[in-house]
């Protein structure tokens, strides 16, 4: 009988083999073709595909020399959360403590909270060691960063000043207290200080990647900066956003304006005005233009709201409700978010004890959860038909994979950040288009793209 380490290694080998088979299918290489081109035996290729032998670095290096593929294509994501949930205790967080100086003085104490190789979070517990005596945005004791690539949701504990550059590149300061929250976009310079000399302020700085991480970022970096930058359209207003989308889709179809006019019966002057952001198109115009470009109308629609790059949400302005509707075990408090990231949701959840054995949640997003209360809570969940339980102490943090059935029992308070990563949205729509029948092959390829024995197609 295999131990857990051997079982995990076996699963990783199988996934690696399925990934390798997917690459061969995409390149239209049969196993025997790959064996001949890589200079190895068909038996070894078959063992790799079947998950019985490791795909060696030597074979990968040969492959990238003869095929139009990248080294990263051959590596699968290591799953460090095999039961669907990962926990980091408050004590483990404390052991990761490091002091970071700015201008030669202690400025922040950083501590890790739970992270997973399969999740987009990079969350930190940060204590503000710099204390200020005023709320001036120009305070020279506040040492600014240069902004960073990741999106950031922040939950505030204690008296903290939050400094940031607004859209007009003016320094601003928000006076934050426990329960307040904010969202900040990538590359916006910012910093934090404490206002209370008796007790340093604290933040949960939950940074995370969205759609531009991983392969997308690599694809952009494979282009020149000049070429890659042109994918960034002007979304500064609704009119400019709409105009940029209309022009982009027309140009990638190599359609002259007069041809679009013929197809849509929209006057050329009107199309020119729309592409110059003179006005927003009507719903009927969007439908006609979408048909002429052979796209869905959603591709041509500007966002309903042009959100600010920094969203500050005082606790007393947050909406509240109870969930589930009947039992009302949880009080939800809606924290800072932005419509620009529709699959990012932040909440404070007040848990009220229940004897119910029901799993109250099944969420199709990655979840970071931090126990900000004073009481321990019980987390119950189910994964692959097995039931699990963990005690969540104050200061503990947990990661929960998407679609895990779970609940919390006890009386306490949690901060929860849910994010989509790279799957919800366009990737989800594409997977839905492929359909449930083919989902398994889309995730992990299980067969060659054709049957060499010419068997009849099984459509059942």
Walk through the language-model features, giving the residues of each.
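A short, Lys/Arg-rich alpha-helix, primarily the initiator
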Residues: 1-30, 229-253
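Short alpha-helical "recognition helix" segments of helix-turn-helix
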Residues: 30-38, 45, 256-263, 289
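Recognition helix of helix-turn-helix/homeodomain-like DNA-binding domains
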Residues: 39-64, 77, 265-281
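A short, N-terminal "cap"/entry segment at the start of jelly-roll beta-barrel domains
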Residues: 69-132, 235-238, 283-286, 291-352, ...
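Short acidic-glycine-tyrosine-enriched beta hairpin
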Residues: 113, 165-188, 194, 335, ...
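A short hydrophobic beta-strand segment most commonly corresponding to one strand
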Residues: 123-127, 181-183, 196-219, 343-349, ...
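Short, conserved beta-strand element in jelly-roll/cupin
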Residues: 127-132, 144-166, 206, 349-353, ...
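Conserved double-stranded beta-helix
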Residues: 208-247, 422-460
